[in-house]
């Protein structure tokens, strides 16, 4: 199963929560002035240059409200679009289109923004041996979508959640007593398929983590020059 398939399978519960948060019992403004069963059309037009991301989420928002809504997509996921480009034509019940508009755009705009920024950084790293990774510092209930956007923009995902891998930070190391003890405990507890990553701040910690058998060394908040020095030890 691909990452995209997994994400799409798990997206509905979050999208439903977002719709419930915004609409609750009804869109009272729209229902005041729009008659029932009136068809309408919406043109989705790009406001600024960037990588488009989240088209399938945009579409799914409306589908969960009304499965008769139709979509004529003019661009593909991950395309670089320009201000003024027509990206999609959406046709359906006008009440549905107006009620779902904000939620659909919230997803599309946020995901496209992340994909665009990731794309800009990925271009700067082109030709190097550097992989651009994300973190777990995501917006609550948006992790699935934000991490997907990083991949669309040209980055890679680090841990998706706390069960994905062992990452020993300063708090874990402090509780264990040392990096060596923390790594040993992790090796005893975790499955052999889990890599053990250790966050370090000093040259001495880099050496200790390597000697302890850590699979990955994370250099925490270091300048490029300091990272070069630490890399030579590894």
Where does each model-flagged region fall?
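Glycine-centered loop/turn positions within well-structured domains
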Residues: 225
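Conserved small/polar residues in nucleotide/adenosyl-binding loops
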Residues: 233-234
């Amino acid at each position: 199963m691909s990452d995209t398939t997994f994400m799409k399978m798990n997206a509905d519960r979050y999208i439903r929560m977002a719709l419930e948060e915004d609409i609750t019992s009804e869109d009272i403004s729209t229902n005041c002035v729009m008659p029932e069963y009136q068809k309408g059309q919406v043109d989705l037009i790009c406001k600024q240059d960037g990588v488009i991301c989240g088209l399938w989420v945009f579409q799914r928002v409306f589908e969960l409200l009304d499965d008769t809504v139709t979509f004529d997509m003019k661009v593909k996921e991950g395309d670089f679009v320009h201000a003024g480009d027509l990206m999609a034509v959406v046709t359906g019940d006008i009440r549905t289109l107006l009620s779902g508009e904000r939620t659909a755009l919230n997803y599309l705009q946020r995901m496209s923004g992340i994909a665009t920024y990731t794309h800009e950084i990925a271009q700067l790293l082109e030709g190097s041996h550097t992989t651009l990774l994300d973190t777990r510092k995501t917006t609550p209930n948006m992790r699935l979508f934000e991490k997907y956007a990083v991949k669309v923009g040209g980055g890679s995902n680090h841990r998706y959640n706390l069960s994905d891998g062992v990452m020993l930070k300063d708090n874990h190391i402090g509780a264990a007593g040392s990096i060596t003890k923390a790594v040993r405990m992790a090796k005893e507890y975790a499955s052999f398929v889990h890599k053990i990553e250790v966050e370090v701040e000093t040259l001495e910690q880099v050496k200790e983590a390597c000697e302890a058998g850590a699979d990955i060394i994370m250099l925490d908040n270091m300048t490029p020059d300091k990272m070069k020095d630490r890399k030579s030890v590894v």
